[in-house]
């Protein structure tokens, strides 16, 4: 099967909400050429009055049309033609040469269009994709349009179906791996054909290490699945530390010719799950150091590029993560490939809703009719990726507490096991939603009043405060989800640490994962994980900041009785990630790394002194407002709180060489010591001790006000064909290279040569700047630009300018 990107030559315009209007060419006045992937929403002007408001980050939800004219080779007239759309948000209707060819309501799933009957091999073809995204449909920033790749696939009438080759490790023992290969062959022609099905497995150097040939007689108009076994001697195993990938080639040979083939990568590894050991990979116990992520990439929106995916995974691995949860929808192919390559375990999630909608026009309006199609495509997409170890069938599903509606869980789990028996199934339960219909009476019994408000789940959790733990730990909640828990291999608990020990005793066969947890709770969660093998890991909300759910991690410095969950305009980001929007580590990520036992060196940060005496109203999704900075201009002589993170007994703080205090670590919060001192420019240093012996030190210094722009590309080249991006990292530094977080300068960007700026901005969660503006204000001293090729080869020059700074140029080769 020939597979090629189908991303070039598209024309985009807004409007055309009805298919009739779109087919009639409505809205063509504002059309523009685009190359996919393309997030149609991220460049739009945000609106404070947007109906979905904070949930969508005040970005607009609109309808879009994409059109393209293409030609096919007449020599392929006897071939089958498919199009794969890896992601279109949402309600995509596909028309080819004016005829309806197919649709997919789900905005996060990949889908296929069999275009064979609709295309011409002698005349140009027209394709139109109508995207109906004009209504609120998500609880976070969804993006819009064709935001992932489109692929054109051409194959003989006798062919392997798309994603039709599935490899699974059945056993690894005594230096030998047994690999099962299932291949689905379709024959849409006539007559009988005698063929040979061949599978070869090649090592990283391209050497064939195992193979099998199977003779097959194919009959007309059939689709059959065939199974082979191949034996690999002395296999190199895939895991987080050694992500070794083999290449497989499965092809149909007829005579001396290869009629069709599929080539891909595969990792040999075994998975085990039990109460005694917990989760094991290749026989070794693995505790999942996990984080949840959404699908946007900050300044480029939801458009998915290979380098953006690799950058995210690499950054998270460097911060100590070994697992990510794709929340709350199927992970992109690019991200799966990055996780395979770099060694990151994945919990891939089906959906945020089943049949009960959370937003008026979300996937819940289609799930009952489309779930089998979408689950099947999820599993087919994931099957050969060794990184995927868990499938989650849902997130915070209210139906899980209803004895009739919870049967959807059984349907989903059974379907996944039918399609893939080599992985484990979980369900990410929020017990507050599972018992929502019982909450008024439970709250009345607890003295809250039977008319207490029950509404949007995150706001409700915030308003209930400490009472939520008691409700979650109650027998009523446990009984409500008992059947749902029995349907899966691992029960996922969202914000239910209070059940871990209780359920471990009550249910001797239950295995638990913290599928979504408060970032501030990792210290106590990890202690339980290390104590009880049946708790296999923790996935914090979130590993990476994201657009939408604006302000859930903010700290409010004003006196207020409001327990408002979201922040008002101009907030656009959640501001709750270990990594900020542009991928820089925030202090909490170092605290997390220390808890995991992966960092020996202490870490110093400071809370903004301008808010020292203000109230600190925090949500559950924040731990601190500390910044790694000793630049607080205008706050000289004012009190300041310094935080020291360390796995040690004591910490001593020095300001400009003078000892402030020596105190125990963990008195208020495990692995943290808080110091009160007075801000003086210069340097602040922490020295930590175990058993009275110094074990490490860390310091931060004041950068001078005479800052310059420092910029560098994170790689020296970018594909000329527009298929990927390269990041340019920008920082405001003094002559000694020290970052000045106070330097909120406006920095302009321009580009010369064969490239374009695909997104530019900072991590500011409340910036009003558009990511396609040419000027952006540095936030905490940093910015990031994404550079994309424009189809030509040559040298791209990115120029950065700011008042009082020398111009800086960065060169990137488009190859």
Where are these regions (language model features)?
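Short, hydrophobic beta-strand segments
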Residues: 115-117, 228-237, 674-679, 772-791
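Short flexible loop/turn segments that cap and initiate beta-strands
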Residues: 192-198, 241-245, 639, 647-649, ...
């Amino acid at each position: 099967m020939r597979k090629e990107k189908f991303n070039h030559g598209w024309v985009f315009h807004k409007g055309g909400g009805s298919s009739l209007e779109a087919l009639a060419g409505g809205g063509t006045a504002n059309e523009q050429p685009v190359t996919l992937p393309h997030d149609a929403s991220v460049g739009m002007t945000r609106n404070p009055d947007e109906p979905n408001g904070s949930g969508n980050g005040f970005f607009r939800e609109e309808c879009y049309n994409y059109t393209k004219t293409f030609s096919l080779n007449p020599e392929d007239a006897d071939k089958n033609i498919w199009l794969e759309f890896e992601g279109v948000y949402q309600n995509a209707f596909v028309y080819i040469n004016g005829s309806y060819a197919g649709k997919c309501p789900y905005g996060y799933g990949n889908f296929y269009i069999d275009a064979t009957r609709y295309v011409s091999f002698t005349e140009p073809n027209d394709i139109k994709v109508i995207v109906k995204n004009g209504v609120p449909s998500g609880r976070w920033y969804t993006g819009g349009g064709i935001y992932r790749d489109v692929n054109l696939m051409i194959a003989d009438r006798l062919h392997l179906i798309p994603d039709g080759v599935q490899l699974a490790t059945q056993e690894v023992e005594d230096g030998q791996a047994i690999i099962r290969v299932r291949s689905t062959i379709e024959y849409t022609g006539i007559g009988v054909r005698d063929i040979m099905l061949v599978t070869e497995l090649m090592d990283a150097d391209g050497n064939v290490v195992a193979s099998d040939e199977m003779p097959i007689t194919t009959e007309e108009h059939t689709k059959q699945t065939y199974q082979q076994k191949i034996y690999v001697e002395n296999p190199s195993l895939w895991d987080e530390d050694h992500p070794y990938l083999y290449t497989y080639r499965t092809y149909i040979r007829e005579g001396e010719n290869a009629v069709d083939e599929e080539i891909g990568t595969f990792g040999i590894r075994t998975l085990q799950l039990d109460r005694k050991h917990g989760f094991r990979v290749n026989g070794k116990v693995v505790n999942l150091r996990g984080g949840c992520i959404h699908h946007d990439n900050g300044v480029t929106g939801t458009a998915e590029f290979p380098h953006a995916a690799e950058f995210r995974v690499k950054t998270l691995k460097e911060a100590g993560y070994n697992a990510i949860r794709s929340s709350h929808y199927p992970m992109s192919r690019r991200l799966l490939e990055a996780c395979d390559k770099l060694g990151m375990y994945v919990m891939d999630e089906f959906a945020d809703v089943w049949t009960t909608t959370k937003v008026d026009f979300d996937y819940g309006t289609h799930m009952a009719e489309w779930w089998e199609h979408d689950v099947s495509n999820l599993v087919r997409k994931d099957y050969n990726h060794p990184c995927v170890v868990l499938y989650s069938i849902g997130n915070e599903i209210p139906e899980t507490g209803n004895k009739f509606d919870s049967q959807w869980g059984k349907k989903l789990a059974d379907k996944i096991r039918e399609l893939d028996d080599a992985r484990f199934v979980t369900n990410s339960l929020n017990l507050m939603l599972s018992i929502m219909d019982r909450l008024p009476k439970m709250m009345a019994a607890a003295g809250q009043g039977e008319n207490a408000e029950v509404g949007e789940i995150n706001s409700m959790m915030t308003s209930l405060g400490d009472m939520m733990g008691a409700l979650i730990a109650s027998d009523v909640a446990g009984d409500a989800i008992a059947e749902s828990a029995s349907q899966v291999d691992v029960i996922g608990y969202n914000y239910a640490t209070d059940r871990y020990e209780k359920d471990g005793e009550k249910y001797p066969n239950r295995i638990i994962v913290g599928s979504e947890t408060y970032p501030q709770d990792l210290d106590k969660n990890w202690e339980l994980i290390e104590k009880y093998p049946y708790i296999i890991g923790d996935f914090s909300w979130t590993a990476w900041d994201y657009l939408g759910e604006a302000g859930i991690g903010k700290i409010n410095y004003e006196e207020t009785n409001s327990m408002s969950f979201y922040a008002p305009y101009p907030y656009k980001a959640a501001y709750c990630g270990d990594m900020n929007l542009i991928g820089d580590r925030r202090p909490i990520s170092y605290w997390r790394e220390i808890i995991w036992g992966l960092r020996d060196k202490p870490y110093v940060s400071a809370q903004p002194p301008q808010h020292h005496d203000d109230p600190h109203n925090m949500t559950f999704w924040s731990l601190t407002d500390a910044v790694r900075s000793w630049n607080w201009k205008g706050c000289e002589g004012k009190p300041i709180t310094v935080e020291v993170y360390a796995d040690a007994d004591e910490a001593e703080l020095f300001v400009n060489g003078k000892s402030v205090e020596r105190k125990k670590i963990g008195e208020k919060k495990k692995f943290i010591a808080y110091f009160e001192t007075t801000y003086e420019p210069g340097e602040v240093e922490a020295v930590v001790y175990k058993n009275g012996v110094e074990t490490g030190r860390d310091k931060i210094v004041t950068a001078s006000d005479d800052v310059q722009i420092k910029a560098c590309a994170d790689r020296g080249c970018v594909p000329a064909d527009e298929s990927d991006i390269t990041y340019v990292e920008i920082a405001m530094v003094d002559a000694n290279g020290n970052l000045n977080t106070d330097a909120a300068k406006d920095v302009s960007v321009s580009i010369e040569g064969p490239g374009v700026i695909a997104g530019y901005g900072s991590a500011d969660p409340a910036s009003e700047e558009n990511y396609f503006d040419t000027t952006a204000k540095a936030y905490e001293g940093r910015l990031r630009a994404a550079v994309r090729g424009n189809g030509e080869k040559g040298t791209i020059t990115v120029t950065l300018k700011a008042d009082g700074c020398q111009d800086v140029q960065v060169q990137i080769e488009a190859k």
